[in-house]
Curated annotation (Swiss-Prot):
Organism lineage string: Eukaryota, Viridiplantae, Streptophyta, Embryophyta, Tracheophyta
Gene: CYP71
Organism, as annotated: Arabidopsis thaliana
Any single biological process term in GO: regulation of flower development
WD repeat positions: 68-106, 111-150, 201-240, 257-297
Listed name of the protein: Peptidyl-prolyl cis-trans isomerase CYP71
Gene3D superfamilies in UniProt: Cyclophilin-like, YVTN repeat-like/Quinoprotein amine dehydrogenase
Region (Disordered): 26-45
Length: 631
């Protein structure tokens, strides 16, 4: 049972990832709902060629690139024809061509007037379709990025999925009726709006469908959480493809027993497993032929809170970061229009990849361990839906290596460019994780966040406001009056104008009055600036987080350095800290915007107060007020 976690402190040091080990699965017919206690006397069997599999998966801690839509992105998909596809709330669909490294924009469609509510890509990667509440299905030729057909429906579609294998004569498409029990099969190339077959499969409307091409079987889930198998050819139960006759012999009632529903279904490339994500934040992995549970991963907030209190560094976060992410999770639970999370398999079917509160987890299903977590440091994005690219997904192409290049001393970089494509909560962007960390260009406009769409008018206005305010003259020193004495600080408005403006405006407005020094670590630093007094609160004068302002001349190279606390890159608010020793490991992570020039003894006095296990002083030490000279 894996989960996310939270940390207490607010933003200074970062921790390295560790792996939590759990027991292996023996074989398909013997289900294990894991992880459970390790069996005595048995050693965990490693996954053969594990490192080779991991080398074919993204590994960067931060997303390499992001590209814009005009509205919140809700769907992402990867085509075997080397295309990425994304859809958004405003009904727009974008095609992106995969290059040797990265992607390039190919085509933009206004697919529907309303939000895209379903996106499906065929197994061969040649066809794509979308549905919305406008009674229409749009079908696209992926390779030529052209809309080839439109099916007008007499009902509102609920789910859509392609149901044909490579080589089939007809490219069949299954569409469910959102308000009835029927599922309809269409031939988009026929030019007809009439289905070639229709059948009532469930006792309730179908909500989710996923095709297993290996067994030519559809797996579907209805609005009550009931799971059904049915043949894509006969629309009957596929007796020859499974090892059970009654669902009571399986775990397929697990979803309804847990009183939840189905968010998404994904099938492994070998057709032997499928995953189900649900609103209860549990990811369930089933064996296809037996319908038995293989794994259950609990990603609930209760487990996250328990792990935050544990000693597992892989799952712990700084307190302010943890609090912010918890607030986002609670907002996410109330947002019905948010993208439905899913859990995808890698090409070997040995690893499961899904987004969590903590980041994107890569789980080794064989050893039941966390292989890696991507994006843990990206505290501004809550990733939801993911799609995986690992090169030629059809497996038909063979990449030939020239003899001269087949040298063991040559580069070990993979021939493909494995990429995770994902969308995030309330974000207008698609994000890509690869095996490369983002570059740091000298020109900030050439950064990893590509502005391929014109920003909204309100965004342009807010940027203009910030820019104009930064041009005004700013104070170069302040005096902080505390319960233990006065601290005189020199500021650097030319090097970091936004940070100094934020700090001095808060000082003038009395924002910091009576704030506690809530975190004190002897031999490190003293921290304050949180109105809540626990490291989870505070905001900037603009009501949102603002970017870091690193300058090569301002480093954490001496004690009594004034620096901004944060929860990751570009997450500055109101909290700040004063170091009591040189802390060079914080360079380029926290914005240095001042130095203490008088009152060092006061800083040392605060540093020496007794604290509890959470570094909170037993005796309250407060900022009384801050004097800012008139500029």
């Amino acid at each position: 049972m894996e989960e996310e976690s939270k940390n207490g402190g607010t933003t200074i040091p970062t921790e390295e990832l560790a792996v939590v080990a759990v027991p292996p699965v023996v074989e398909e017919e013997e289900p294990m709902v894991g992880p459970g206690p390790a069996p005595r006397g048995k050693r965990k069997r490693p996954l053969q060629f594990e490192q080779a599999y991991l080398d074919s998966l993204p590994s960067a801690n931060m997303y390499e690139k992001s590209y814009m839509h005009r509205d919140v992105v809700t769907h992402v998909a990867v085509s075997a024809a080397e295309f990425f596809i994304s859809g958004s709330m405003d009904g727009h669909l974008k095609f992106w061509k995969k290059k040797g490294v990265g992607i390039e924009f190919a085509k933009h469609f206004r697919s529907h007037l309303g939000p895209i509510e379903g996106l499906a890509v065929s197994i061969d990667g040649l066809l794509c379709c979308t549905i919305s509440n406008d009674h229409a299905v749009k079908i696209y030729d992926v390779v030529n990025y052209d809309m080839m057909a439109m099916i007008r429906l007499p009902y509102i579609p609920g789910a859509v999925e392609w149901v044909y294998k490579q080589g089939d004569v007809k490219a069949k498409l299954a569409v469910s009726d959102r308000d009835s029990l029927f599922v309809h099969i269409y031939d988009p190339r026929s030019g007809s709006n009439e289905p070639i077959a229709s059948k009532e499969i469930h006792m309730n409307p179908i909500k989710v469908m996923k095709y297993n091409p290996v067994s030519d079987t559809m797996i579907s889930g209805d609005t009550k959480g009931i799971i059904e198998y049915w043949s894509a050819t006969t629309l009957q139960f596929p007796e020859d493809e499974v090892n059970f006759k009654l669902k009571s012999d399986t775990n397929l009632f697990e979803i309804i027993k847990c009183k939840t529903t189905i968010s998404a279904i994904e099938v492994s490339p070998d057709g032997k497993q499928f995953s189900i994500t649900a609103p209860d934040r549990r990811i369930r992995v089933f064996w296809f032929r037996t319908g038995k549970l293989r794994r259950v991963y609990d990603e609930s907030l209760v487990v996250a809170q328990d792990l935050q209190r544990s000693d597992a560094p892989l799952y712990r976060l700084e307190a302010i970061d943890f609090g912010r992410r918890m607030a986002v999770e609670k907002e996410l639970e109330k947002t019905e229009s948010a993208p439905q999370p899913n859990a995808v398999f890698d090409e070997s079917s040995n690893f499961l990849i899904y987004a969590t509160f903590l980041g994107i987890k890569v789980i080794n299903l064989h050893t039941n361990t966390v292989a890696r977590i991507l994006g843990k440091v990206e505290s501004n994005e809550r990733y939801l839906r993911v799609a995986l690219y690992q090169g030629d997904q059809g497996g038909k192409k063979v990449r030939k290596i020239p003899a001269a290049a087949a040298n063991v001393n040559e580069s070990k970089e993979p021939l493909t460019d494995p990429t995770i494509l994902c969308c995030a909560f309330k974000k207008h962007r698609i994000y890509m994780f690869s095996r490369r960390e983002p570059e740091e260009p000298e020109d900030a406009s050439q950064g990893r966040d590509v502005f391929n769409e014109k920003p909204a008018a309100d965004e342009l206005m807010s940027v203009s406001d910030i820019g104009n305010s930064a041009t005004t003259s700013l104070p170069e020193n302040v005096i902080m009056h505390t319960t233990l004495g006065d601290i005189h600080m020199k500021l650097y408005p030319e090097e970091c104008p936004k940070t100094v403006e934020n700090f001095t405006t808060h000082c003038r407005n009395g924002y910091y009055d009576n704030h506690l020094f809530h975190r004190v670590i002897r031999g490190f630093m003293i921290q304050t600036g949180d109105p809540l007094g626990d490291g989870t609160g505070g905001q900037s004068i603009w009501g949102r987080e603002f970017e870091d302002e690193f300058h090569k001349s301002l480093r954490h190279d001496r004690p009594f350095t004034l620096s901004m606390a944060n929860a990751g890159p570009n997450t500055n608010g109101s909290q700040f800290f004063i170091t009591t020793v040189a802390t060079p490991w914080l360079d380029n992570k926290h914005t240095v915007f001042g130095r203490v020039v008088k009152g060092m003894d006061v800083v040392q006095g605060i540093e020496k107060v007794k604290t509890d296990k959470n570094d909170r002083p037993y005796q309250d030490v407060k900022i009384l007020n801050v004097t800012v000279p008139k500029s």
